[in-house]
Amino acid sequence: MKKLNINDYNDILNEVLNDIRPTELEKDKLKVFSDKIIAKIKDISKYPVLDIIQVGSTARDANLKDDHDLDIFLRFEKETDRDTLKESGLRIGKEVIDYFNGKSWVEYAEHPYVSGEIEKFNLDIVPCYGIENCEKIISAVDRTPLHNEFLIMSYKNKNLSDDIRLLKKFLKGLGIYGSDLKTAGFSGYLCELLILKYGGFLSLLSDVKNWRPNKSIVLNEIYEMYDLKKEHEFLNFDDSLVVYDPVDLNRNVAAALNEENLCKFIFYSKMFLENPSKEFFYGFDKKITDFLNIRERGYLLTLEISRPENIVEDVIYPQMEKIQKSINKLIKEHDFEYIRYQNFADENTCYLSWEFLIHELPDVKIRTGPPVYSEPGVVNFITHNEHYFVKGCNVCAYKTRKYKNIQILFEDIVNGKLRKIITYPKYVCPENAEIRLGTFVERT
């Protein structure tokens, strides 16, 4: 295998950058548009709005080409009551978008905010409270302007924009970009902190290849900001990756990242460094899935459950995972074996899918009882089991299975006969669901 030099990587990375770097014209149009929006907000916003800030990747020249998302935060004084914050934020957001003949709607997080479309631009106008670093938040989004200020300050005299874009595109290619609960991957803010820490895309990957779960990262800037000594003991987190938030040391920026996605990042960082290719940046996860599916399939089964209206993905996906894990426990208790499981939700339906290695079993099974020398236990066991015998050191018995086919088990689930055994979350109820045989719904 030929030894690689920096040019082997740079040629590929420059090709990718040509695809993902916004043009100067695109940047200029975005700047003109954001200036117009902020100027209009200043015209109509009144006390108690402290200031108006553009945040997010477009504010820091860290966005990908054709990313026209604009995030505007309205910072309110801490004394502002929540109703005033909510009502003012919604009023200002709607009025601004209406002024530019856009389309607006209300999104819901901890409190509602206005989203909209104006021409080709996507716009969020979000109210929050003005707080200081490490000060207790009042609403969940209060840190965001502080993140923006920290990154802009830290980027001075550093040209990191392209490295951030490469990391985002690499993670998108692997299907692990996004901190929503569906993806359980890397947020944009986390990407920027990692590039800031390691100084570049290749430097980051060179370190990542040696990572293990529970890796902990503290940015050098944190020690300077808070005048901390290197031996300072930070709060412990039980997460797959820990990256301390520079504006709130009690928060792990990587908390949403699950262990499997961290391990994908480690594995494919090694793969890229050993054999660099543009392939990693463009739908690589789908190519892997398609390749793995060129094989003999197991027994496929999908539950189709109606999705309630107005329930966001960050609520639906944890609940799908919860019900599926509860069903998985029942599956194993009845000796069926699955190769994999997956969940996915579209606008109207929640899909819980399994691929079974064993979906049909004989009528009989062996029930293992206590050791033969456990007299009280043995007496109780043979009293309740007619066909008993000794196997090894235990008394055992043949029992007739309740379920010899996985489909029958699932029919009892959807008919509500196992309600007392399965944990039902609030919004994902398997009763009256449709059972689809021969179907496995992949996430998209």
UniProtKB/Swiss-Prot annotation:
Its cofactor is Mg(2+). One of its GO terms (biological process) is RNA repair. CDD domains: NT_2-5OAS_ClassI-CCAase. Transmembrane segments: none annotated. Pfam families: CAA_C (PF21133), NTP_transf_2 (PF01909), tRNA_NucTransf2 (PF09249). SUPFAM superfamilies: Nucleotidyltransferase, PAP/Archaeal CCA-adding enzyme, C-terminal domain, PAP/OAS1 substrate-binding domain. Keywords: ATP-binding, Magnesium, Metal-binding, Nucleotide-binding, Nucleotidyltransferase, RNA repair, RNA-binding, Transferase, tRNA processing. Homodimer. Catalyzes the addition and repair of the essential 3'-terminal CCA sequence in tRNAs without using a nucleic acid template. Adds these three nucleotides in the order of C, C, and A to the tRNA nucleotide-73, using CTP and ATP as substrates and producing inorganic pyrophosphate. tRNA 3'-terminal CCA addition is required both for tRNA processing and repair. Also involved in tRNA surveillance by mediating tandem CCA addition to generate a CCACCA at the 3' terminus of unstable tRNAs. While stable tRNAs receive only 3'-terminal CCA, unstable tRNAs are marked with CCACCA and rapidly degraded. PANTHER family: CCA-ADDING ENZYME. This is CCA-adding enzyme. It comes from Methanococcus maripaludis (strain C5 / ATCC BAA-1333). The lineage of its organism: Archaea, Methanobacteriati, Methanobacteriota, Methanomada group, Methanococci.
